[in-house]
C-alpha cells in the first residue's frame, strides 16, 4: 500500500514475545508451568526448531519507538532479540534456572503440521537499529536468561498460578 498508494504505513514484526501473563498455549509458559507442577517429564512438540524469543518489555519498547517516525514508512522492521535458541535448549535453561531435573517427551499431536512448521525463525535487528535507534535490553544469552528468571518468578507466585488452568494445555 505504501508503494502503490503512497499510504504512510510500515510493517513492524515482533518475534516470539514472552513474559509474565502469557497464555499457557505458548511454549515458554507451557514448559515453566509443567515444571512447577513437579512433572518429571514434560510434553512438547518439535523441540529442534529455533526461535528468537523477545521479552515483553523489549517488544513494547520496540513498538513505542516507532511512534512519530516518518522515516519508517514503507519499511518492514523486525523487533527481536537477535538471539536464537532451540526449544529443547530453552527447556534445558528453564530447568537449570528452576533447579529441576525433568525429561522432555516429544508428542506428535503437539507438533505443527509439517508444511506449517518453521524450523528456524531468526530476526535481524539492523533496520530497528537504523530507523528506530532501538535494540533489545535483554540481549544475548545473558539477557535471555534474565528474562526467563523474571518470567519464572511471575509464574511461581501462588496468586498467579491460580489465574491459569494448567490442565487445559498441559495434559
Predicted regions and their residues:
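Conserved beta-loop-beta element that borders a ligand/cofactor-binding pocket
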Residues: 1-20
Amino acid at each position: 500500500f505504501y508503494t502503490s498508494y503512497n499510504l504512510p504505513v510500515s510493517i513492524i514484526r515482533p518475534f516470539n514475545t514472552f513474559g509474565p501473563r502469557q497464555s499457557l498455549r505458548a511454549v515458554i509458559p507451557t514448559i515453566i508451568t509443567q515444571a512447577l507442577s513437579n512433572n518429571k517429564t514434560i510434553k512438547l512438540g518439535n523441540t529442534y526448531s529455533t526461535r528468537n524469543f523477545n521479552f515483553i518489555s523489549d517488544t513494547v519498547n520496540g513498538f513505542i519507538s516507532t511512534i512519530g517516525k516518518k522515516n519508517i514508512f514503507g519499511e518492514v522492521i523486525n523487533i527481536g532479540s537477535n538471539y536464537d535458541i532451540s526449544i529443547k535448549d530453552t527447556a534445558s535453561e528453564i530447568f537449570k534456572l528452576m533447579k529441576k531435573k525433568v525429561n522432555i517427551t516429544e508428542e506428535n499431536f503437539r507438533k505443527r503440521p509439517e508444511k506449517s512448521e518453521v524450523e528456524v525463525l531468526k530476526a535481524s535487528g539492523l533496520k530497528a537499529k537504523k530507523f528506530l535507534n532501538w535494540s533489545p535490553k535483554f540481549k544475548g544469552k545473558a539477557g535471555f536468561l534474565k528474562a526467563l528468571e523474571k518470567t519464572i518468578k511471575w509464574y511461581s507466585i501462588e496468586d498467579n498460578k491460580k489465574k491459569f488452568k494448567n490442565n487445559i494445555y498441559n495434559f
